[in-house]
Amino acid sequence: MTKPISLSNRALYARLLSYVRPYWKAVFLAVIGMVGTAATEPVFPAIMKYLLDNGFQAKDARMVWLIPMGIVTLFLVRSVIVYCTGYLMTWISSRLVTDLRRTMFAKLLALPTHHYDEHSAGQMISRLVYDVSNVTDAATSALITLVRESLTAIALIGYLLYLDWKLTLITLAIGPVIAFTVKSFSKRMRAASQKSLQAMRFISHTIEETISAQQVVKIFGGQERQQKQFFEATEQFRRAQMREAIPASAMTPITHIAASVAVAIIAFLALSQSTGQAGASAGSFISFITAMLMLISPVKQLATVNPTIQRGLAASESIFELLDAAQEDDRGKRQLLRSKGEICFDNVSLRYLGAERFALNDISFRITAGQTVALVGASGGGKSTISALIPRFYPVTSGRVLVDGIDINDITLASLRQNIALVSQNVILFNDTVGANIAYGSLQTCSRDDVIRAARAANAWDFIEQLPNGLDTPIGENGAKLSGGQRQRLAIARALLKDAPILILDEATSALDTESERQVQAALAVLMKNRTTLVIAHRLSTIEHADCILVLDQGRIVETGTHAELLRAGSYYANLSRLQG
């Protein structure tokens, strides 16, 4: 498995903010707005100072109107700036979420097959949904708080220094206390946040697994087991959140206590007139206290934003782990335009990542253009593994796989796979229409007539015509509205439409009734003519006419020959034939 990346908080946050860089103009405008908001903060205590020192004694009638109007104007301007800043940051946040999810999804499509073997669908879904939300909070919401409250604090501290720099420096002694508190709690919150993310991935995995296996759950009475697993997952998440809440909740009261001590010191020194200007007049004193109390809010916000940042950093580690994962090796430079269909396995061995034994051992065989070769043997013998090596779903451990005499590692993945059609016993359909499932991916440019011809050849047109909207009928999640045989025939129609020179059939007719199988076999016989076909078969009756049959056992080829030759040999294949009657 891919190990989590290890970066310092600063490097991790810098990388996270790099995704905000394309929107620097909007960020710049938002920062200007925050500067404007911060600049208005000291104005109110300054007005209070003037009001207390001069307002009640002043005889100027204009001040009776100017001061109230100034207060209203101040908060009106501030409100407009806050609105514009909030809207801009929300826009940036939505763009960041979209960009991150698109980048991650594109990465998912480029990951090698073994990555999907090691990570559940629920875990990957959680990364795209939950982790991205946490990262966005850290990169936008937390950024707003950091910039806005820092600027506000700077503006208020500047005003306090203007009123009485000595008293201000004394009260700023609480700064190291708050900084120490934040630093000491950050590591604990980061660890707790990582536990929360892991627990959320387990929740997503449990939900995804239960939904996809709902029929098995019902028929085998697994509701209690799945519910227990889900309860355990949610309990893990709750406990992780509570561990995160301990330091997060403690930071605010500690900040308040430190601030209250500072205010108490100010009050004592001002009232005792042991310092200068702040205690010189009632206006100065009230203005100083007001500014000091206003300073508590940004300080508190700066302290409480840390949990959001730590959650975002923990989530960004998970996201960057995915983004930094190795993609499929596609260093091949040669384009395979239209393959002849010649396939050669040259002393191929394969051991899956983390496996102790080899799945394939020294496999060698050659398929000439247009030949039909069948792979038979017990489950786990290596049949599906061989078929997975041709489109390079897995890299070989040793040896070579060649197509038209070219090592497939030297061929671009796209052009190699363009020459291969696959029909698996595990039919995959998409939540779309019948026609879109047949003309899927690169086939979507095919004409409607071509789609109909493929459906007819796969013995699927009769049932398609009976559907409410024919080819335009939605089929539900993975073809849930169709029968097993209908789903299988759509997959065959998709392969027929692709018209690739290399065809891989993994028990492609297993879900068909006798009559449908007869018709599909006839259609496949036409399709297989002058095409190289690799058939993985469990029922030997389906491969009697294969040009060559390879019998596999525990990752090795133990017999080779035609159906008749292998029966006459009276060995492994003949025993399989007798067992199937």
Curated annotation (Swiss-Prot):
Keywords: ATP-binding, Cell inner membrane, Cell membrane, Lipid transport, Membrane, Nucleotide-binding, Translocase, Transmembrane, Transmembrane helix, Transport. Residues 28-311 form the ABC transmembrane type-1 domain. Signal peptide: none annotated. It is found in: Cell inner membrane. InterPro entries: AAA+_ATPase, ABC1_TM_dom, ABC1_TM_sf, ABC_transporter-like_ATP-bd, ABC_transporter-like_CS, ABC_transpr_lipidA, P-loop_NTPase, Type_1_exporter. Its EC number is 7.5.2.6. It is a multi-pass membrane protein. ATP binds at G377, A378, S379, G380, G381, G382, K383, S384. It is an enzyme of class 7 (translocase). GO terms for molecular function: ABC-type oligopeptide transporter activity; ATP binding; ATP hydrolysis activity; ATPase-coupled lipid transmembrane transporter activity. Its main location: membrane. It comes from the Bacteria. Residues 343-579 form the ABC transporter domain. It catalyses: ATP + H2O + lipid A-core oligosaccharideSide 1 = ADP + phosphate + lipid A-core oligosaccharideSide 2. SMART domains: AAA. The chain crosses the membrane at residues 27-47, 63-83, 154-174, 251-271, 279-299. GO terms for cellular component: plasma membrane. Homodimer. Involved in lipopolysaccharide (LPS) biosynthesis. Translocates lipid A-core from the inner to the outer leaflet of the inner membrane. Transmembrane domains (TMD) form a pore in the inner membrane and the ATP-binding domain (NBD) is responsible for energy generation. Belongs to the ABC transporter superfamily. Lipid exporter (TC 3.A.1.106) family. In MsbA the ATP-binding domain (NBD) and the transmembrane domain (TMD) are fused. This is ATP-dependent lipid A-core flippase. It comes from Albidiferax ferrireducens (strain ATCC BAA-621 / DSM 15236 / T118) (Rhodoferax ferrireducens). The lineage of its organism: Bacteria, Pseudomonadati, Pseudomonadota, Betaproteobacteria, Burkholderiales.
